[in-house]
């Protein structure tokens, strides 16, 4: 399988998926990004067993699936061509190449976990503010999220602390 995409798209995939890669060596396939290519698009998925991300970018490839590891990307580039060579994967950045060992195993199934059902409530948040609020609870094992109303945001509750995260207005 051969996948060609813009360098910026590839770099964005690496950045977005890295926090969703498993740190555990028990299931090496969860330390990869699944690239599912069809109809001129690539859906990059990463799952560590607890959280999942899907990220869609344009590409040029035959329909198919390839699992790739996180790699260090060059600082500059215009395009990347990813080639599956049975036991290795080649990343050709035009100015340089990287060849890595292919991780054995069947690609993890990500379809259907993130539903396309119509939501009962939709709330918009500034991701930086949301992260800042959650960072205050990193010492907790569990954080409860209480949603009162889409205009009132939600309340994060820990053992002995709570935080209010206000929403961003969404046009309907």
Predicted features along the sequence, with ranges:
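DNA polymerase processivity clamps
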Residues: 1-172
């Amino acid at each position: 399988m051969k996948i060609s995409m813009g360098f910026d798209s590839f770099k964005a995939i690496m950045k977005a998926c890295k926090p969703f890669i498993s740190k555990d060596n028990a299931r090496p396939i969860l330390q990869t990004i699944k690239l599912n290519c069809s109809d001129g698009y690539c859906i990059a998925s990463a799952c560590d067993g607890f959280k999942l991300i899907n990220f869609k970018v344009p590409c040029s490839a035959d329909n198919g699936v390839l699992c790739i590891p996180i790699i260090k990307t060059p600082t500059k580039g215009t395009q990347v061509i990813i080639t599956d060579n049975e036991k290795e994967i080649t990343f050709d950045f035009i100015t340089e190449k990287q060849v890595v060992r292919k991780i054995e195993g069947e690609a993890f199934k990500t379809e259907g976990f993130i539903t396309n059902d119509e939501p009962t409530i939709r709330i918009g948040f500034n991701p930086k503010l949301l992260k800042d609020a959650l960072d205050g609870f990193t010492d907790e094992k569990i954080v409860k999220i209480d949603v009162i109303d889409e205009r009132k945001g939600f309340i994060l509750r820990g053992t002995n602390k709570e935080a209010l995260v206000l929403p961003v207005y969404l046009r309907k």
